[in-house]
């Protein structure tokens, strides 16, 4: 019986040095642990296909110290941060995890807990709806409802994890780790970078050798090996543009029924699908 059953909520799209740091910090902080990763599969929270398939991602995770990989169902993995978090926390709770450990830009767990409590009140919900009714995007409306409190991408996810734990009366203990060096859209710093930056390189227009050289120091050796083996078969949204365009035009009247679709976005998608011949 392990003393600490640690839950991680991950996408590994792709697995990079920051992810390895996350695992190493868990081993440093929690002795006698088993690490269970709930991972999005072939489709990720951005609603995009994963760069490499879920089996390759799981293979990398297991090679780098994760003990068990559980796939997060696509219904949850492609949703908003709130539903993504609820589904993930529910899985970890059912697996009797003692802790959930996540990266955070602020690494201020007490502050995030206070914000989580506020954001679950009726007053906050009313304020949020009012800002959304003004046509603001969800992140902007959320920030304004919190009196212009600015949260970075991983802090927003951390907040949703805390809300999910509180909302389900889970006994899981949350723990935050300082996110190393870079933010979601940042470039390379001291061999740390965001997954977004790595995908940008790999899906860019440079030669294969140049791309691989640029990411070699940003990912662990085994992750690099898998990415090299899968080079040329990476998945990205633009690969599916013809199918997406066909469905938008064919099912234009039904687009408004998509969950969380902002008012008017259905018409914009339809108009641009008629006018454009490629994803860019």
Give, region by region, the residue ranges found by the protein language model.
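Active-site cores that bind ATP or allylic diphosphates and position pyrophosphate for catalysis
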Residues: 72-280
């Amino acid at each position: 019986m392990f003393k600490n059953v640690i839950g991680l909520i991950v996408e590994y799209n792709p697995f990079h040095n920051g992810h390895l740091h996350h695992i190493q910090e868990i081993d440093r902080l929690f002795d006698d642990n088993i690490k269970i990763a709930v991972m999005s599969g072939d489709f990720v929270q951005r609603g995009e296909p994963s760069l490499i398939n879920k089996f390759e991602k799981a293979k990398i995770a297991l090679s780098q110290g994760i003990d068990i990989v559980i796939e997060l169902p696509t219904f949850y993995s492609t949703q908003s941060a709130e539903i993504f978090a609820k589904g993930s926390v529910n899985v970890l709770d059912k697996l009797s995890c003692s802790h959930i450990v996540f990266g955070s830009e602020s690494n201020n767990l007490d502050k995030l807990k206070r914000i989580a409590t506020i954001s679950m009140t009726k007053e906050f919900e009313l304020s949020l709806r009012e800002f959304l009714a003004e046509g603001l995007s969800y992140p902007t409306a959320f920030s304004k409802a919190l009196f212009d409190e600015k949260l970075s991408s991983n802090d927003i996810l951390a907040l949703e994890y805390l809300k999910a734990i509180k909302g389900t009366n889970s006994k899981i203990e949350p723990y935050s780790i300082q996110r190393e060096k870079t933010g979601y859209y940042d470039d390379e710093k001291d061999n740390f970078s965001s997954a977004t930056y790595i995908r940008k390189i790999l899906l860019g227009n440079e030669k294969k050798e140049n791309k691989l050289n640029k990411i070699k120091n940003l990912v662990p050796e085994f992750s690099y090996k898998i990415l090299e083996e899968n080079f040329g078969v990476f998945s990205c949204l633009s690969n599916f543009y013809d199918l997406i365009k066909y469905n938008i035009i064919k099912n234009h009247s039904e687009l408004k029924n998509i969950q969380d679709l902002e008012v008017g976005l259905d018409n914009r998608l339809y108009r641009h699908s008629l006018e454009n011949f490629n994803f860019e």
